Amino acid sequence: MIPKIIHYCWLSNDPVPDVFDKYIKGWHEKLPDYEFIKWDFSKFDINESEWVREAFQNKKYAFACDYIRLYAVYSYGGIYMDMDIEVIKSFNTLIDKPYMFAYEGKKNQGIEAGCFGTDKNNEFIGKCLDYYKGRTFIKNDGSFDMRPLPQIMQEIYNKNGYNYQIYSHEYFTAKSFNSGIVNITPNTYTVHHFAGSWKSDAEKDRIKRLQYLSKKYGWFGKNYAELKSAHEDYGIDGIIELLKSKIERKVVRRK
C-alpha cells in the first residue's frame, strides 16, 4: 500500500509563484488526510549527490528535483507531485496497490514523472535512483545533461522488463503538452499544467505559439508550428529529421 504522504520540491530562494500556491491549497482541500513533505535545503543536503549539486549551482532546479523526487519516494514511500499539478480528486482509490504510475502522453510514451507514487523501497524507483550514481549534470563538453525524467524512467522500465499496470494519460496528466488543451475524464485524478521551469524563455515562447496555433487551426496549426520550430532550431536538416520521425512513428503504429 502507498503511504498517505505527498512529497514536493522547491529549491529556489525565490517566492513560490501564486499559481503554485493555489494548486498546493487545492492539494490540502482534496487530500485532507495526507501528510505533506516539502523538500528544500533543510530537508535534503544537495552535496549528497554530484548531480543535484551541479544542477542546483547552475539554477536548474527542476533537474535537481528529478533526483530528489526519486529519493523521497524511495526512502519514505508516498506520492510525489510537481507544484504545477492540480488535484481533481483524492488518490484513496489507487493507494491500495504498491505503486501508481501513468503515461505522460496519449501514445503511451514516457512515464509521468510529475505525479507518481509507490510504497517504500520500490525496486523500480531504486533502479531509477541508480541511474544517477556517479553521473554529473555537467557533461564533458560543458553542456548540461537535460534529458527529461519521463524518458529515463520509461527506458529503465523497459530495460528491466517490469510488468506494472500503468494508467493512461488521462489519469495524472490530462493535458496536451503541444496544444495546451485539458481533457478531464472520470478517470482523471490530477492535471499536469506543464510549467516547464527548466525550459528557456525562447522554448516557452515556442510552446505557447504551438499551443495557440493548435487551438486555433487544429491539426494543420500544430504541424505548421512543429515544422517552423524545427527549421528555426536546425534549418532544413531539422525539418527532414522531424518528418522522418513522424513517418517512423506511423510505421510502428501500423505493425
Can you describe what each PLM-predicted range is?
Residues 1-65, 83-255:
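Glycosyltransferase-associated regions of secretory-pathway enzymes
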